[in-house]
Amino acid sequence: MTASITEIDSISEESNVESVSHLQHSPSFEKKGADFSISLNEKKDFASPITEEIPSPDGIATPEPETKKKLSFGARVWDLICSPGRQHDVCVAAPTQLVRSCDDYANSASTLVTNDDGTKTKVDSDEKKHKHKNVRDYIRFKHVDIGGRIFDLITRLAGTSFTFILMLIILIVWAIVGGIYRAPDNWQIVMQDGSSIQCYVSDTLLMRQQQNQHIQVLTMISQLRSRLLTTSRLLGPVLNDKTKISSVNVALMKDDVGDAEKLPTENWFDFICNYVSFMVGSIIFLVVYWIGIFIWIGFGRMLGWSDEWQLYINTAVAVELTFTSVFLQNVRHRHMKYIDRCVTSIFRIDSVIEEELRRMMGDKEPNEEITIKMDKINLGERSIDYYADLIGSGVGVVVSTCVFVAWIAIGNVMHWDSNWWLIIGTYTGLVGFLDGFVLRNVYFRESSKEATEIQTLIDEDYALYQKLDLPLPHEHITNYKSTFGGSLSQWIGWLCALPISVLFSVFVILGLIIAAGSLRFNETAQLFCNTPTMIIEGALLIVLIEAHNIANLKRRIQFRQIHLRRLTILKMLAGDNYSTTSTV
């Protein structure tokens, strides 16, 4: 089932493309009367059929004609309840260059000139100017509803360097206050509650960030494959006609996206973050973390296994959770910026290649739409996706707000004592424990899907080079080498990502609640709930950072090599006229 959501206006070649709205449930996107369309086709349940979109003569996608029964009110309510977590196929056609434009422009000699206003100008033999605007960038998604856009804005802000530095300042101030007042219990409880609430919110933002970046990467891949099909179709005949190649006059693009293995550092903060990301996500850091836990257990008998003993580890882990959760958001944000920069450069190169090939061949056939089919999932994975979708949506925000309001409301009844302070930490700690496993499971499956689709794109790249009998360039420059620590971290990550691991976390939570209930949820019971869940959640975040580092490093290298292969094709087309002095 698909439904038209919004329209996109054409923009100039040097500006960013207007973002295409992305609605999580059954969205579809078209550009009316234009060359491209983006849609997310909904897969209901596990393998239900979807309504295909077929292009009409005027370029507007229209549903396949079929008789459709109107759902009853009860059926619509049930459909709404079941909608979170549904899988969607991604259908994208890259913006076609010079399709349906004037014949004089398409057949004239190539003089790619970019004016200040971003409009390309060509002059034919009659000195008559023709202007045309082409979409150079790739099409981006954004939510169509105002609530979704605000949520996405908050998610982006949470990943910025400003937010990360602000959190570091708060931790430093808290540590100074504790030193002045000699670390009283209330000081420790404040950190535990604050950390639990912050991690609870961060889990929501991390899930939202993960979902948005996943659909964005699949959209990038689909559009790259769409344009590659056109390039492959037109490039062979052009290369066979050497007389046409000499007419290409393009001085465009230099290799300026930076090293994929060592991210480009814009300032000292980026340099430090790259190093810290490597250290925090390493197997060494994870081993040190667990050594610290066992040392704490060793002091248990000396301290009489008291509440104070539990407070110590809870406070230490709370600091680690706050740091790693905010740091993970920042790492993802910075890594995605590099990929966006690299893919933007690839798209601009691709658009120039496509435009030149179409001019030479007089071709106006639109770029083909590429559909990425979502994998079939089982009942357990569907349940996990349902919960994850609720976390990363407005529903999760509403539930969180209600819980915090209820907690504040009972404060006066409980006389604002230590037990009241611990209640919110217990709730957010238990939920955060489950969220950690859910995040890992969803990330593992989404990352695997992205890796599969990127490899499909690479295989099609290789097929083009083989078809043209060209050597693959630059493959020796950057190749990911797995280490023992990296392999061990990946294995631990895989183990934590299993659906059975998520189910295990649910049983652990139920067991802790039953045990705490037998103690009437007193201070000792709540600390007992917090301690093991916080320890495991802290370890899961370390594993998640390492998993992201490994997967993102591979992805950056792959996009980087795609960029270099596109530059090779552009240089081959331009011949001696190619220059690397211009910027992207």
Swiss-Prot record:
Entry-listed glycosylation sites: 522
Single GO biological process annotation from the record: zinc ion import across plasma membrane
Transcription regulation recorded as keyword: no
Transmembrane segments: 161-181, 278-298, 311-331, 390-410, 419-439, 494-514, 527-547
Annotated stretches, region: Disordered: 1-28
Bilayer disposition of the protein: Multi-pass membrane protein
Residue ranges annotated as Extracellular topological domain: 1-160, 299-310, 411-418, 515-526
UniProt induction comment: By zinc deficiency.
Keyword Cytoplasm found: no
Subcellular location as annotated: Golgi apparatus membrane; Cell membrane
GO molecular function, one term: iron ion transmembrane transporter activity
Alphabetical keyword list: Cell membrane, Glycoprotein, Golgi apparatus, Ion transport, Iron, Iron transport, Membrane, Transmembrane, Transmembrane helix, Transport, Zinc, Zinc transport
Function: Required for Fe(2+) ion low affinity uptake. Has a role in zinc uptake under conditions of zinc limitation.
Protein name (database record): Low-affinity iron/zinc ion transport protein fet4
Protein source organism: Schizosaccharomyces pombe (strain 972 / ATCC 24843) (Fission yeast)
Gene that encodes the chain: fet4
